Amino acid sequence: MTLPLPQVIPCVDIQSGRAVRLYEGDPDRETVYFDSPRAAARHWVTLGAGFLHLVDLDAATGRGENRAVIAEIVRELGVPVEVGGGVRDRAAAQSLLTAGVARVVIGTAAVRNPELVAELIAEYGPERVVVSLDARGLEVATHGWAAGSGVSVADLTPRLAEAGLRTLIFTDVTRDGTLRGLDRDLMRQVRGLWHGELIVGGGVADTNDVRLLAEEGIEGAIVGRAIYEGTLPYPVRL
């Protein structure tokens, strides 16, 4: 039986106005792939991407923000994008959604204030609100991955389901940007904890990882370094 191909979503991480990739989420260990995030986004759309994942790393770490660049990408490229990084309150989420972003990605705020997720879903609908749980093992990391939260994925997922969340992003921060490949056991655990749409980030290295996701019934992956450096050819074909 042929398994459905998981959706592979190109990621554009934006730091100091450039498209970069971080090693294990460390803002001081960056690789610059494009001097212009707009050029990076345009590159993936030209290759056939129908959806993009943008992360404002400066907003996530409190070092600034890149909202103007993100707004330009949304206006110019004509494909839906989701945006995360520093979306910690209602005003930040509303600003992005009213600017034309297809959906916002809530990270730290979903851990600290799950009610915010429910409020945004009630106002904008579950198709426009996504939660990203960035974790070391099954402990959620917060504030640009710099801190452990003491909250487990197992504790949080039932509350998110109750809030009406449909789509969850899970990132293994210990593998993000490393090309080490996915941890199958961890992926299986998370799949068992979340019964809605599950998108995985962090560690996808090649087609073997895409097959792993298909085998575990995971709907998609956000991929950065592997497609920028060519270890996973894009568009992906198995």
Curated annotation (Swiss-Prot):
GO terms for biological process: L-histidine biosynthetic process. Pfam families: His_biosynth. It is an enzyme of class 5 (isomerase). It catalyses: 1-(5-phospho-beta-D-ribosyl)-5-[(5-phospho-beta-D-ribosylamino)methylideneamino]imidazole-4-carboxamide = 5-[(5-phospho-1-deoxy-D-ribulos-1-ylimino)methylamino]-1-(5-phospho-beta-D-ribosyl)imidazole-4-carboxamide. Keywords: Amino-acid biosynthesis, Cytoplasm, Histidine biosynthesis, Isomerase. Its EC number is 5.3.1.16. One of its GO terms (cellular component) is cytoplasm. It comes from the Bacteria. The active site is at D13 (proton acceptor), D134 (proton donor). The keyword Amino-acid biosynthesis applies. InterPro entries: Aldolase_TIM, His_biosynth, HisA_bact_arch, Isoase_HisA-like, Isoase_HisA-like_bact, RibuloseP-bd_barrel. It is found in: Cytoplasm. GO terms for molecular function: 1-(5-phosphoribosyl)-5-[(5-phosphoribosylamino)methylideneamino]imidazole-4-carboxamide isomerase activity. This is 1-(5-phosphoribosyl)-5-[(5-phosphoribosylamino)methylideneamino] imidazole-4-carboxamide isomerase. It comes from Deinococcus radiodurans (strain ATCC 13939 / DSM 20539 / JCM 16871 / CCUG 27074 / LMG 4051 / NBRC 15346 / NCIMB 9279 / VKM B-1422 / R1). The gene is hisA.
